[in-house]
Amino acid sequence: MPMDEGDAQGSLLLEWKQLNYYVPAQEQSNYSFWNECRKQRELGILHDVSGHLKTGDLIAILGGSGAGKTTLLAAISQRLRGNLTGDVVLNGMAMERDQMTRISSFLREFEINVKTFTAYDDLYFMSHFKMHRRTTKSEKRQAVSDLLLAVGLRDAAHTRIQQLSGGERKRLSLAEELITDPIFLFCDEPTTGLDSFSAYTVIKTLRHLCTRRRIAKHSLTQVYGEDSFATPSDNGSSGSNSIEMEIVDNSHESLLQAMKELPTLGVLNNSPNGTQKKAAICSIHQPTSDIFELFTHIILMDGGRIVYQGRTEQAAKFFTEGFMQPKNCNPADFYLKTLADGQGSKNAGELLRAKYEHETDGLYSGSWLLARNYSGDYMKHVQNFKKIRWIYQVYLLVIRFMTEDLANIRSGLIGFGFFMTTAVTLSLMYSGVGGLTQRTVQDVGGSIFMLSNEMIFTFSYGVTYIFPAALPIIRREVAEGTYSLSAYYVALVLSFVPVAFFKGYMFLSVIYASIYYTRGFLLYITMGFLMSLSAIAAVGYGVFLSSLFETDKMASECAAPFDLIFLIFGGTYMNVDSVPLLKYFSLFFYSNEALMYNFWIDIDNIACXVNDEHPCCQTGLEVLQQASFRTADYTFWLDCASLLVVALVFHIVSFTLIRRYINRSGYY
C-alpha cells in the first residue's frame, strides 16, 4: 500500500515492521512412561510481517485456518503477550502497550458482556470508566444515546443483553468499544455467528466510521419527525438524538441518501477525535462478496507471512498472472482457494508470497515521517486523558455486582431458600437441646460447630465458581485499562459483606429460637457477628481456591483436600493441643473457638448427675479447657482479629495469583 505525501499529511499512520512471534511447543518423549522428558522448541506464528494502516482504511485480513490472522491483529494492537519482536510505530513514534490501548479498541470474536444489563445500562456503565472524569452525567447519557443510534440499537436500548440477537450483541460490543472514540479499531472475526444481513450491517457500520467526514449539525425532524430527532440548540450543542453523517460532496442528493441509510451512519457528536477519520482492521473468515467489497484494503496471509497487501480492487490484477478467476466467483473465495491449492513443486502461497515480496521491496520508506509532528500533538492530547479515581471505580463495580444480583433475584431466592432449609433442619435436629446439663454440653458444641461449618462452606463454595467464570471479562477490561484489577477485587469482596451479615443473622435466627433462647439477646448479636466474620473469612478462602485454577471444575475438585485438613484442625474431630501450630492455619479453629468461648465463658453452673461415670464439667470455663480452647479475656477479640487476618492473607495471595495470571496471559 504505497503512500504519497498528501496521504501522510494530517493522517495518523500506524506501521508495523518485521513482526515475529513465537510460542513454546512441547514434544513428548516416547521413552518416558510419565512423559516427563520433554524437548522445548519454539513454533513460529508470524514471520517478518510488515505493513501499515492509515486513517480512512478498512482492512480485511484473510487467510486459512492457522494462517496467523488473529495473532497478527493482536500483535499490531499490542494486545499480545509473549515472544514478540518487531516495531509498531505511529507516524514514526514507537508505540507502547499502554499508549496503544488509549488510541485503539479491540473487538473480540465472542461478545463478553454482563448479560443481565440492558444495552443502555451496559453502555452507560462503561462510559463512567472510559470517558474523562470531568464528563457530566448528561454528556454521558447523550453519548450513549448517540452510540445506540449509531449502531442501530435505539429500539433495543432497554432490552437485556441476554435477549438480544447475535447481530445486536455484536453491534453493542462495537458501541462499547466506540465510547472512547478510538482512532484505530481492531476487530477479530466481527461476523462470526451472524447471518448475512447482520454481518453486512456490522461491516457497513465500520466502513462508515472509517470514511466519514464531519458536517455541520442538521435538524432531521422534518424528515423523521419530532419523536426521532431533536433540533440542535443555537450554541452548537446537539439535542438528544442529533447526529452527524458521512457525505461525499455538498449536494442535496448526497445528504438525503446518507439520511436514508440510518441508523448505521450515526457517530458521536461530542467526539474528541471528530475531525479525524478512523481506521479499522478485521480478521475475517470467508466474507460474502457484498461484505468483501466494503473493505478498502485486504491482507492475505499464508503460514504466518503476508502474501498480498493492498487495495481491494488491485488484488484481482495481482492474481491475474498465473491464476484464472472464474466468472461470478466471490473474489475472497477465489483468493483463499488459490492459497490452499498446490501448483507444481511449490504451493500457490509460496509463489504469491515471493511475488509480493519482490514487488514491495523497499516500499516502506518512512513516508510517515511527514506527519510526525501531527502525531506528537495528538498523543499529547491523548495523554491528558484522566480516568476516574480508584475509589470511584470500586464504588461503580460494587453497584454492578449488586445490580447483577438483583437481576438474578430468582436464582438468588432459590439459593437462599435452600440455605434456610438447612437452618430449619438443624433447628429440628437440635430442638431438644435446652437446659445446661452434662448431656447437652456435647450437643451444644456440635450445634455450634455446625453453625461455623455451614457459614464457611456456603460462602467458600459460593465464591469458588466466581473467578473462573469472570476471567474473560477481567482479562478484557483490565487489559484494556477500563479499571484496575485491585478495584475489581476490592469491589468483589465488599459486595459480599452485606450478604454475609444478612445470611449470618437470618441463619442464626432460626437456630437460636429453638436452642439458645434462654441466653438473651446479647448472645444473639455477638454470635451473629461471629458467624458473619466467619463468612467474610470464608470468602477469602473461596477466592484463594478459585485463584489457584482456571476452571471452576478443577477448583471444586481440588478444594476437598484443603477442606479436610482445615476441618480436622477446627477443634471438634481432634484436640487442638495435638496440633499446636497447624491449628492457627485453620479458619474453622478461630470460628469454632470464638463461638464456643462466647457461649460458655459466662456459664457458672452446669448440673452434674450423681452417678455419672464420665468427667463432669461444672462451669463453662471447664468446658473450654476440656476442648483445649483459650480462656483469656481477650480470646473473643483475638479470634475476631485472627479471622480478619486469615481473610486478609488469603486475599493477598489470591490477588497476587490472579494478577500474575492476567499479566502473563494478557488479553488472550
Curated annotation (Swiss-Prot):
InterPro entries: AAA+_ATPase, ABC2_TM, ABC_transporter-like_ATP-bd, ABC_transporter-like_CS, ABCG_transporters, P-loop_NTPase, Pigment_permease/Abcg
UniProt-annotated binding residues for ATP: G63, G64, S65, G66, A67, G68, K69, T70
Bilayer topology term: Multi-pass membrane protein
Keywords from the named record: ATP-binding, Membrane, Nucleotide-binding, Pigment, Translocase, Transmembrane, Transmembrane helix, Transport
UniProt xrefs under PROSITE patterns: ABC_TRANSPORTER_1, ABC_TRANSPORTER_2
Residues in the Cytoplasmic compartment per record: 1-412, 475-490, 546-561, 659-668
Gene Ontology cellular component annotations, sorted alphabetically: plasma membrane
Gene3D superfamilies (UniProt xref): P-loop containing nucleotide triphosphate hydrolases (3.40.50.300)
Chain ranges of the ABC transporter domain: 31-328
Main subcellular location of this protein, as a coarse class: membrane
Tissues expressing the protein: Expressed in eyes.
One Pfam family here: ABC_tran
EC numbers on record: 7.6.2.-, 7.6.2.6
Annotated GO MF terms: ABC-type transporter activity; ATP binding; ATP hydrolysis activity; pigment binding
Subcellular location: Membrane
TM regions (residue ranges): 413-433, 454-474, 491-511, 525-545, 562-582, 638-658
Extracellular side, ranges: 434-453, 512-524, 583-637
Domain of life of the organism encoding this protein: Eukaryota
Catalysed reaction, written as an equation: guanine(out) + ATP + H2O = guanine(in) + ADP + phosphate + H(+); riboflavin(in) + ATP + H2O = riboflavin(out) + ADP + phosphate + H(+); (6S)-5,6,7,8-tetrahydrofolate(out) + ATP + H2O = (6S)-5,6,7,8-tetrahydrofolate(in) + ADP + phosphate + H(+)
Family statement: Belongs to the ABC transporter superfamily. ABCG family. Eye pigment precursor importer (TC 3.A.1.204) subfamily.
Stated role: ATP-dependent transporter of the ATP-binding cassette (ABC) family which transports various molecules including bioamines, neurotransmitters and metabolic intermediates. In the eye and probably in association with w/white, required for the transport of the eye red pigment precursor, guanine, into pigment cell granules. In Malpighian tubules, involved in guanine uptake. Probably in association with w/white, involved in aging-induced intestinal stem cell proliferation in the midgut by regulating tetrahydrofolate transport.
Quaternary structure annotation from Swiss-Prot or TrEMBL: May form a heterodimer with w/white.
Protein's UniProt name: Protein brown
Lineage: Eukaryota, Metazoa, Ecdysozoa, Arthropoda, Hexapoda
